[in-house]
Amino acid sequence: LKDRQAWERAGIALPSYDVEAVMKAGRENPAWVHFGIGNIFRIFLGGIADRLLEAGAIDRGIICVETFDYDVVDKIYDPYDNLALSVILNGDGTVDKKVMGSLAEAIRAKSDDAASWARLKEVFRNPSLQMVSFTITEKGYALCKPDGSYFGFIEADINNGPEKVTSAMSIVASMLLERFRNGAAPISLVSMDNCSHNGELLRSSVITMAEEWLKKGFVEEDYVAYVKDESRVAFPWTMIDKITPRPSEKIANDLEASGLEAMQPVITSKRTYIAPFINAEGPQYLVIEDSFPNGRPELEKGGVYMTDRDTVNKAERMKVTVCLNPIHTALGPYGVLLGYELFPDEMRDEDMLKVAKQVGYVEGMEVVPDPGIISPKAFLDECIYERFPNVYLGDTNLRLCTDSSMGLGVRFGVTIGAYVEKYGDAKKLKAIPLAIAGWLRYTLAIDDQGQSFELAPDPLVEGVREQLSTVVFGDPSSLTDQLRGILSNENIFFIDLYKAGIGEKIEEIFREEIAGVGAVRKTIRKYVSEF
């Protein structure tokens, strides 16, 4: 970074703060630790820290912890001295580029790697630590399979105890034990993943691990009491929003053409798509419940809304159940089926734009909570007219399908439940049943031209495919009762869709969509004409 002019010639802004000093301060007296150090973390939270550093509101960087994909540390953090290049893709085609020096250190959270494990403990012992944030995806908090039994790796972590853990939740519980036994300083654990009541989800999983270890005699009762005491260990709720697609090869090539070296994206062994740069949209929202018993950075100066739990909950419900995520989940699978690689291209399809508007403005807006700090209508307008059509983002429909089964309850089930509460059933809904049928049709992995394609990674999709294994593309009569076990599953949808009055309707749409080549388009057109 010493040759500032070369960077400026390439149109890249550099930090005005002393990067080495900031990293050193972060390592010596950490205030902020983050788990799950991929793209959204680097550009959004790393970006907030970068802004705070530029404003002089903080003086140290974030400690970055990876529990799942260690390639990220080896291929992206270490070789580039923990620097990250932010590339903001504006809707008008302009690009804002900046090097960020806000990431102080990257640690592999491996209990079988003595040096890394000791270092992580050292960080958690330090009373200077105020907050630990998380972007580990919703499945990172899950301890149990859909049937309620523990995953095998969680069972192992319970039986092996705090010193031999492998999963994110067990690692966090183990680090809280280290903090408890070394002064029990207060701390705030902040889930920033895109799921409802994320703080409650994190708290529940960490407490479960603590209680299971207590039963096995690994920990003391006072430790469990510490983890449960929100005046000492807080779990604030949050709402986060910034569309961050996979790194674009085109941007990598443009950066290399401007004089930078080794900018190409890598795909890790765990299928993480990552690069030395992060490309994302400009708009972003982070709403955090202000519950920090050990103090916190002045996050407001980085554009964060600090508020109470009720407001966070409303903002999160607005986004996740109405304005943004349901539209992604409604359109992503159909985009793949209709041959649209890019989501913004699908938004130019008149039929699909109508589906998006029906899901948001009509079906969702009727039951949306208003958080007060952000207008739902203005937020949805920004999504439909500015964010989603931003072709420069290059957001793919396949990315929108990743782990989509985990979000069906939040993104559709909550609204369906609100209709049942309001009207006795959800039969008024038209676009949401169409969306659910489209997701099921997508899981067959045959597009509307009859060509097979590879599904995005998703933990439940294999189970769904097994239940649909006797459904034959081109033969609507092959659908008998295969969908019943899925559509009645409250673990997936939060509600039995037959009891809500729309299970049969979804079956009917799905039956039409498997009729053969072109059936998906024909079916969408038929139902859109009824909106």
Please name every model-derived segment.
Residues 1-531:
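Substrate/ligand-engaging "lid" and interaction regions
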